[in-house]
């Protein structure tokens, strides 16, 4: 069996992964707060840990991996969005507006992540469906002396958990000394954090032993992971921005509520995403939602996925238009190579080895380039599938109704791809290239340049060689632009 090695944030080492139960490998990834469309940075952990999910399924069997990714559907930002609609004159109840907003945002999220080629997790719990489990965990923490109630709030007693800060490498005393925020008067200690907070009458709330209120953010993941994966499970993952305080607080809550378990054995964190070398920000004009890239800029989801996988998850990833263009051109060539090919029975050993070595997706992609250079379409298709690439679903490619290659046409209907034997554009392209050749021989360079500009403008790639002009179709080929030159 393939040995998987993963970098464990908790131990700061790359370790051989040994599941608790090979028949049920368990993975939890923190999901989105569903108040607006997912931005490009939200897509990185989804794609990275989708590759991990695929790898685990390949090694241990599809039915032996349980993957949980939650939706946080109770949050101040969600409330604010619903209140804004209410203030704008919507007559419906705030509860109805919140439900509509969260349902709509989850639908958007699924559309975007499906387009990125991400498999759906085994479970996608909504926080509001697990309030009872959260209340039960909070009651248990109070009974064990790890939490206390003040003025309708329930707070976790941070100093009751001696290992607090171990994941992020922080000292509680140092954090207090460096704090620059006003401490709520009902806290015993500045580091204590909220497990439950009161809700105003107009805001969402649930009855509890401490009055009507709603859960704090951190308790949600602790309760849902316990209910769906147990007190101890294999891997907990998410973005590096969640390492502190969210993941640190999850560990404290879960280990104090269930000391018999160890919570997550392995912690994995993907690094941040930059755009053109800078932090993504609306004020800088470099903030993109995945929907923006797909719909407004016409970048296929598969292209976005390949760019995200081009940098190791443990390093900051820089999104640029140049990387997207390169990925698009590469995937176009690979899709043509594999269009009429059945995948090989197993992936390339070097691709599998790269992914098993701490999800080394850049090395895996480099190997895919080598396989493509050997024109082994069957092996390329099987191997790329481990990275969620070259799937039969076109993953957002916007293609003309018929794409000609030197020997066939790919006809696209919806998301299905079919190969047929006619070549409606080949003769046109070759006729134009022959006219260009004759114009050059006759030293009519104005006309030869016009023909070249016409072909290039239509998305035809031309390479002049001593033996004559060679051509191929680029990813932006549009037969409608194959008019006559001036």
UniProtKB/Swiss-Prot annotation:
This is Cysteine--tRNA ligase. It is found in: Cytoplasm. The keyword Metal-binding applies. One of its GO terms (molecular function) is cysteine-tRNA ligase activity. Its cofactor is Zn(2+). GO terms for biological process: cysteinyl-tRNA aminoacylation. It catalyses: tRNA(Cys) + L-cysteine + ATP = L-cysteinyl-tRNA(Cys) + AMP + diphosphate. Zn(2+) binds at residues 30, 221, 246, 250. CDD domains: CysRS_core. Monomer. A motif ('KMSKS' region) lies at residues 279-283. InterPro entries: Cys-tRNA-ligase, Cys-tRNA-synt_Ia_DALR, Cys-tRNA/MSH_ligase, Rossmann-like_a/b/a_fold, tRNA-synt_1_cat_dom, tRNAsynth_Ia_anticodon-bd. ATP binds at residue 282. NCBIfam families: cysS. One of its GO terms (cellular component) is cytosol. Belongs to the class-I aminoacyl-tRNA synthetase family. A motif ('HIGH' region) lies at residues 32-42. Its EC number is 6.1.1.16. Keywords: Aminoacyl-tRNA synthetase, ATP-binding, Cytoplasm, Ligase, Metal-binding, Nucleotide-binding, Protein biosynthesis, Zinc.
């Amino acid at each position: 069996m393939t040995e998987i090695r993963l970098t464990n944030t908790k131990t700061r080492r790359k370790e051989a992964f040994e599941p608790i139960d090979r028949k049920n490998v368990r993975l939890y990834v923190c999901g989105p707060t569903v108040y607006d469309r997912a931005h490009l940075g939200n897509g990185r952990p989804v794609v990275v840990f989708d590759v991990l999910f695929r790898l685990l399924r390949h090694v241990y069997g599809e039915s032996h991996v349980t993957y949980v990714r939650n939706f946080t559907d109770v949050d101040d930002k969600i409330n604010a969005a619903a209140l804004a609609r209410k203030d704008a004159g919507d007559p419906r109840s705030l509860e109805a507006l919140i439900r509509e907003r969260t349902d709509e945002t989850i639908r958007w999220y699924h559309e975007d992540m499906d387009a990125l080629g991400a498999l759906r997790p085994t479970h996608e719990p909504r926080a509001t469906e697990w309030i009872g489990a959260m209340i039960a965990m909070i009651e248990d923490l109070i009974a064990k002396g790890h939490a206390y109630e003040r003025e309708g709030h329930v707070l976790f007693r941070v100093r009751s958990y001696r290992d607090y800060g171990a994941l992020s490498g922080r000292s509680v005393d140092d954090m207090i000394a460096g704090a620059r925020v006003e401490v709520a008067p009902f806290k015993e200690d500045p580091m204590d954090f909220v497990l439950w907070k009161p809700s105003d009458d107009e805001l969402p709330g649930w009855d509890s032993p401490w009055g009507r209120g709603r859960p704090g953010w951190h308790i949600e993941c602790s309760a849902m992971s316990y209910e769906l994966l147990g007190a101890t499970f294999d891997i907990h993952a998410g973005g590096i921005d969640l390492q502190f305080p969210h993941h640190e607080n999850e560990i404290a809550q879960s280990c104090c509520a269930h000391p018999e378990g160890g919570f997550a054995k392995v912690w994995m964190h993907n690094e941040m995403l930059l755009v053109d070398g800078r932090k993504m920000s609306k004020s800088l004009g470099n903030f993109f939602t995945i929907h923006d890239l797909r719909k407004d800029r016409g970048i296929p989801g598969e292209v976005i996925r390949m760019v995200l996988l081009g940098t190791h998850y443990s390093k900051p990833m820089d999104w640029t238009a140049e990387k997207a263009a390169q990925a698009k051109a590469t995937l176009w060539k690979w899709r043509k190579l594999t269009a009429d090919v059945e995948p090989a029975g197993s992936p390339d050993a070097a691709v599998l080895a790269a992914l098993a070595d701490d999800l080394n997706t850049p090395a895996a992609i480099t190997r895919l380039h080598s396989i493509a250079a050997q024109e082994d379409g069957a092996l390329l298709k099987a191997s790329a599938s481990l990275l969620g690439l070259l799937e039969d679903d076109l993953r957002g490619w916007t293609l003309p109704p018929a794409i000609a290659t030197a020997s066939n046409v790919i006809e696209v209907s919806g998301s299905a791809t079919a190969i047929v034997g006619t070549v409606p554009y080949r003769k046109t392209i070759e006729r134009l290239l022959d006219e260009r050749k004759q114009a050059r021989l006759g030293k009519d360079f104005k006309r030869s340049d016009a023909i070249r500009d016409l072909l290039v403008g239509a998305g035809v790639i031309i390479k002049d060689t001593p033996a004559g002009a060679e051509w191929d179709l680029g990813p932006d080929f549009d037969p409608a632009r194959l008019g006559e030159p001036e």
